[in-house]
Amino acid sequence: MRAGERKWGGWRQPAAIAVAVAFLLPLWFMVSGSLREPGLPPPRAPELVPSPISTASYHEAFDLVDLTLYTVNSLIVAALTVPLAVLVASLAGFAMLLVAGRARVVLIGLSFVALMIPVTALLVPRFTMFRWLGLIDTWVPLIAPALLGLSPFYVLLFYWSFRRLPRELFEAARLEGMSPFGMWRRLGMPLVRPVTIAVALLAFIASWGNFLEPLIYLFDPDLYTLPLGLRSLETLDRTNYPMLLAGAVVATAPVVLAFMIAQRYFLHEDRGAGWLGR
């Protein structure tokens, strides 16, 4: 090990602990605040553990609005959005790998251009299109972006991951008569599994926390997703901070759980699974 590596190596663990504390403290205070008695104002000083501990705020939040229904709605939308986004983004990324010459450069450039377009710039055209199709007040406008890979970033991420694989692998498969779809399914996807899981997690977070599009397209309360449910909760009782924090915990818990399940695969060095971490 070099002297510079030894010098910085001693700081890695303390730095990692500091970053972890910076991210975990807000979550801890959110959970702690949700366990206070309903209606209490925020504490004047940071409170690691409330006294007494009460779950009444959770009961009150679920009684005030139908958080169970909104959670199920969000899960349904995410369950449809995430697989579609992964499928389309991976196919598009692999197709970019197979395109040769200047066409590939043009496609990459167009992807970067699309990536820089603000989402808000597309709201009016999208709303006009979905209204013309009669799809307002349905979940289709929330799921439809997944048919385009949800984000050009996911397409580029798959393309870069496929590009890191040995070209000889695909050349040999082509000589054996394997179709492009077969190469994607049998060679490409198994070897970029960490990237697939990362894209799935990012797509889940984007779908789960999507507030603006449900606010624009959904009017029936029975179709509301969880972010809109939290907005309804805040509208009905905006000064009940423990109850609002309880709703925030309900909305945050699935994302944290998904990350805890998926994070061990991100840089997993296994057979063909370490391409992302090299």
Tell what function each PLM region has.
Residues 9-278:
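A structural signal for multi-pass alpha-helical bundles of membrane permease subunits
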